[in-house]
Amino acid sequence: MTIYIVDLEAVDTRYTKEWKKYLPLQLKRHTNSKVEVISGGNTPQATTPGAFLNFGGTNVYKAKQMQQIGEMFCNGKIKDGDYFLYTDAWNPTVLQLRYMAELLGIKIKIGGLWHAGSYDPQDFLGRLIGDKPWVRNTERSMFETYDNNFFASDFHINMFVDTFKEFGNYVGLTTDKTKVRRVGWPMEYLEGSMSAYK
């Protein structure tokens, strides 16, 4: 099995820069699996005013990731049992990933880390777009596409389920059938980097 990290673009002033370096190392150490990062390359560091990323740049980044994923399928690289971890679940390429895997009969698993979305009134999607049908239906579709939907806290899970009530039946299950999992974000690397400040 190979774990493919479909990462979020690294912004120097955010933890996404640290994840680019440390997340592959942590996953390799904890799973003993082969880990590969599917990166979209360099991205503009200037963020869209009022946001933490560049609204145009993030889509260029994701388009480059999608091209790589498509080529990996074309070249026969993706195998049964491979796992794709999206470090930001709000990535529409997950839909095309599932499309290719199912049409080609390749049994993969996909996980996504939900940071925010239209269901969060503090997020730019919640503030600027709100509950427009296109954004809500996109988030529903992405949720269903993921085998594992990872959230950092019960607060975040509750906020999601308050908006998408139909997904509440996944919360609290302790079987493999659950699609909702509360996990801590992968920041174990901070222990070493913060020890100097004790």
Question: How would you label these PLM feature ranges?
Answer:
Residues 99-106, 165-166, 184-185:
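Catalytic phosphate/metal-binding cores of nucleic-acid and nucleotide-processing enzymes, i.e., regions
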Residues 83-90, 101-124:
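Active-site proximal beta-strand in glycosyltransferases
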Residues 58-62, 124-131:
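Short, flexible loop segments at the rims of nucleotide/cofactor-binding pockets, characterized by
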